[in-house]
Regions:
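Short, Lys/Arg-enriched N-terminal segment that forms or immediately precedes the first helix
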Residues: 64-78
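Short alpha-helical "recognition helix" segments of helix-turn-helix
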Residues: 98-108, 113
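Generic, well-ordered alpha-helical segments
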Residues: 58, 62-65, 81, 94
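General nucleic-acid-binding
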Residues: 1-62
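DNA major-groove recognition helix of helix-turn-helix
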Residues: 106, 117-121
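Short, amphipathic alpha-helical "recognition" segments used to contact nucleic acids or chromatin
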Residues: 81-97
Length: 121
């Protein structure tokens, strides 16, 4: 027999839903970033295929800004992915799942699961 959801269960589910919505938004940002990076790489491949000098082209390109944007997008994705995973674990714990079972399901050590549950708000 399934137990009724408590207020805490509803709260944990709401937190997990919000975390996965943020993860989804971050994923879309990474998709946009990789689409842009792919376009830049395609253009660079065309220049390289023609064996034309690329020093001036690359010198006029703001590589630092591109790298910073890519790093920020990937960092945001990774942060939201970690938060979503921990929110899901909290729901699983509330449903009676043990840390050992969570670690087996996700292929992680119990120590890592415990530490992330403790350290990630």
């Amino acid at each position: 027999m399934r137990r009724a959801m408590t207020d805490n269960d509803h709260h944990l589910h709401s937190l997990a839903l919000a975390a996965f919505e943020q993860l989804h938004t971050a994923m879309l940002g990474v998709v946009d970033m990789f689409t842009h990076e792919s376009q830049v790489t395609t253009a660079l491949l065309g220049v390289l295929a023609q064996r034309t000098p690329i020093t001036t082209l690359v010198g006029n390109f703001d590589i630092t800004s591109e790298r910073a944007s890519l790093t920020a997008a990937l960092d945001g994705y990774e942060t939201h992915r970690r938060h979503a995973r921990v929110a899901l674990w909290r729901v699983m714990l509330a449903e009676g799942c043990s840390i050992g079972e969570i670690s087996r399901i996700f292929g992680l050590s119990r120590q890592l699961v415990s530490r992330q549950l403790r350290d990630i708000p």
